[in-house]
Regions:
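Phosphate/nucleotide-binding beta-alpha loop and adjacent structural elements of enzyme active sites
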Residues: 1-237
């Protein structure tokens, strides 16, 4: 089925300097710089074509990026041309290890997921966990997760890594696609002592007081937050 994707669809998922600059200036991405260790490791889960990976590579010691859809992964690998501190993997990250069905958004390639969100077509993908992939890693300082509704599965497969490294987290929480109740991701992070912020476009970071407040922001302000939340770990300087 992948070979049937049109050139028009494939062209929609290429690195775009305009959108890169926009996300650095106005979205959560630009707010992450102060929370990335210049010598640390960043994990980009659901990396797409690498617009966030590029920013992380500029500001960290090394980036490990994961993208499940092969033609999107091919675009992601081009980041390596400019950033030697970058590694890409054609693996879907979740809470298990093995093989599974993954649904490709054949119209835009942007809403591909373990969930069939947009009448996609299935492909078989390799699946792993953050804990498995990075059990021997040093100084994982930041993890970004954008997996179209399965972010909690990624977190559940990263518990050992989170406990060991105390990374800051950037997580998409988009109720329309969430596999689980909206409060569950907030609870996972708040239970581990994280403080939470959203990016009010044009105004900067604003605090999320508690789980209930986070759910309200996620449900009512997606156009302002772009669905992204920043969770800061107080144990990391």
């Amino acid at each position: 089925m992948l070979e049937l994707l049109s050139k028009e669809v494939l062209q929609r998922r290429v690195f775009n300097p305009y959108y890169y600059d926009l996300h650095v200036k106005e979205f959560m991405l630009g707010q992450t710089k102060d929370h990335i260790d210049s010598e640390g490791t960043v994990l980009d889960i659901g990396a797409a074509v690498g617009q966030y990976s590029k920013f992380f590579a500029i500001n960290s010691g090394h980036v490990y990026a994961y993208e499940a859809v092969p033609p999107v992964y091919e675009q992601l690998c081009k980041i390596k041309n400019d950033h030697l501190n970058f590694s890409a993997y054609n693996i879907a990250i979740s809470d298990k290890v093995g093989k599974d069905k993954f649904y490709v958004d054949g119209q835009r390639l942007s809403n591909s997921s373990f969930q069939n969100l947009v009448d996609g077509f299935p492909i078989d993908v390799e699946v792993s966990t953050i804990d498995k992939q990075h059990e021997n890693a040093n100084n994982i300082c930041f993890i970004k997760i954008d997996t179209e509704g399965t972010e909690l599965d990624v977190l559940n497969g990263a518990k050992k890594t989170i406990d060991k490294h105390d990374p800051h987290l950037m997580i998409e929480i988009y109720p329309k696609f969430n596999k689980y109740p909206v409060d569950t991701t907030f609870k996972f992070c708040f239970d581990r002592g994280y403080t939470c912020f959203y990016n009010h476009r044009g105004r900067g970071l604003k605090p999320v007081k508690d789980i209930e407040h986070g759910v309200k922001i996620a449900l009512t302000m997606p156009e302002i937050t772009d669905g992204d939340f920043l969770f800061l770990n107080g144990n990391r300087a």
